[in-house]
Regions:
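Acidic, metal-coordinating catalytic cores used for nucleic-acid/nucleotide bond scission
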Residues: 66-70, 92-94, 119-123, 149
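Short, ordered loop/turn segments at secondary-structure junctions
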Residues: 64-65, 91, 143-146, 172-173
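Glycine-rich phosphate-binding loop at the start of an alpha helix
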Residues: 46, 98, 120-124
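A contiguous pocket-lining binding segment that forms or flanks enzyme active sites
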Residues: 110-170
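Short phosphate-binding loop-to-helix
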Residues: 89-102
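Distinct, well-ordered alpha-helical segments
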Residues: 70-77, 101, 126-131
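Active-site acidic carboxylates
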Residues: 2-91, 106, 137, 154-158, ...
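Glycine-rich phosphate-binding loop signature in dinucleotide/nucleotide-binding domains
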Residues: 104-110
Length: 234
């Protein structure tokens, strides 16, 4: 019982106890992803970024060989964090760049939520070294990360889990941060993320808002609804 009471990995994620790092969400890296649909990957990554912004999670964005190979980070991700410094690297392992280590230390949170490309390379090596050398706890966002094959992604996730990484998904992380729907200061922004990024769940929320609670539809443009006009039937 004593060990369980002192096991910090049993704690839920909160806005106060964690930080976030996005690793190499760049076009050339995304081109190689075969473990999941790449548009879904991008959707999930941007949704996670928006959630981190809502809850004021200290966030790091790092990139590799932007000009010579990988290309610019998803614009939709960067737009969530205007003015954010981007930590450029040459190393595959983010831990091998001193700027990244310094940023992690400055944020002062031992729980690190990680999303990146590719799972079997940059995510795996960073996680192993950050746990071993930095004593960080790693929460790997499986559906905002991708590998060159499904097997590569799955095996990398298994290796990391065996080493002590905690696997999570983007919506799981966001809802752990929210925790209680009575927290009204973040309720509406969280539901906006759900409506835009959570697929069928989001469509269901849209339906409930507009058809049950009679809230206005969320599109920004105006549209007329023209009444039915039956055509002649012969």
């Amino acid at each position: 019982m004593g060990d369980m009471m002192t096991n910090s990995k049993l704690e839920v994620l909160t806005p106060q106890n964690c930080q976030m790092i996005f690793i190499d969400h760049q076009p050339q890296m995304a081109f190689g992803v075969q473990s999941m649909d790449r548009q879904v990957l991008k959707n999930n990554t941007v949704a996670l970024a928006k959630a981190a912004k809502v809850f004021n999670i200290p966030t790091i964005i790092t990139t590799v060989e932007t000009e010579s190979f990988s290309g610019n980070t998803y614009p939709e991700l960067l737009d969530v964090f205007p003015g954010q410094d981007i930590l450029e690297r040459t190393s595959m392992n983010s831990w091998d760049d001193q700027k990244v280590r310094d940023a992690l230390a400055k944020n002062g949170k031992k729980k690190v939520v990680v999303a990146g490309l590719w799972t079997e390379v940059c995510n795996n090596s960073f996680s192993q070294c950050a746990m071993l050398e930095g004593d960080y706890e790693i929460y790997m966002v499986a559906d905002a990360s991708g590998g060159t094959t499904k097997e590569a992604h799955d095996m990398a996730m298994q290796r990391m889990i065996q080493a002590g990484v905690i696997p999570v998904t983007w919506q799981q992380v966001m809802l752990e941060w929210q925790r209680d729907w009575a927290r009204k200061e973040t309720y509406t922004p969280v539901m906006d993320i759900v409506r835009e990024h959570s697929g069928a769940y989001g469509m269901g929320v849209d339906y409930a808002y507009t058809m049950v609670h009679k809230a206005p539809s969320r599109q920004e443009s105006e549209h007329r609804t023209l009444a039915p006009v039956p055509a002649p039937v012969r």
